[in-house]
Amino acid sequence: MKLLIVAVGTRMPAWVEAGFGEFARRMPRELPLQLVEVKAEPRTTGKTVEAMMAAEATRIEAALPARCRRVILDEHGADLTTMALARRLEAWQAGGEDVTLIVGGPDGLSPALKATAHERLRLSSLTLPHALVRPLLAEALYRAWSVLKNHPYHRE
């Protein structure tokens, strides 16, 4: 099984790439974590928010594997604890299907793309900088894996 993060936005600050890379590198070979960036629609074109999200959704769809479990990151998604995410990761692994976590752009994800999701997760009830999602999600997935393996990284 593979974990794939498909995220809208390119040219992130170096700290984002370093943070994501650190936790992606720690993931085991049997559960690799990869990132695919898709171009955000320029906000200066005069298009409506809906049109921009639709254009980004088309790019996201093109980046998705043919078969995968789609998990949308959404402010209205399930709010999981670390232990609950670990159980979810365990269930994903048992299912054997690759899992793609989808991160929208500044305006979020189109309703049509959201409708294709198998599930929705929320990282936090706080409003966070968009760039912070990648390293935060990578760390959360690594921590969930460490819980499942009784690795000392996570402490209760």
Curated annotation (Swiss-Prot):
Its EC number is 2.1.1.177. GO terms for molecular function: rRNA (pseudouridine-N3-)-methyltransferase activity. S-adenosyl-L-methionine binds at L73, G104, L123, S124, S125, L126, T127, L128. It catalyses: pseudouridine(1915) in 23S rRNA + S-adenosyl-L-methionine = N(3)-methylpseudouridine(1915) in 23S rRNA + S-adenosyl-L-homocysteine + H(+). InterPro entries: Alpha/beta_knot_MTases (IPR029028), RlmH-like (IPR003742), tRNA_m1G_MTases_N (IPR029026). Keywords: Cytoplasm, Methyltransferase, rRNA processing, S-adenosyl-L-methionine, Transferase. SUPFAM superfamilies: alpha/beta knot (SSF75217). Homodimer. Specifically methylates the pseudouridine at position 1915 (m3Psi1915) in 23S rRNA. Belongs to the RNA methyltransferase RlmH family. NCBIfam families: PRK00103.1-4, tRNA_RlmH_YbeA. This is Ribosomal RNA large subunit methyltransferase H. It comes from Aromatoleum aromaticum (strain DSM 19018 / LMG 30748 / EbN1). The lineage of its organism: Bacteria, Pseudomonadati, Pseudomonadota, Betaproteobacteria, Rhodocyclales. The gene is rlmH.
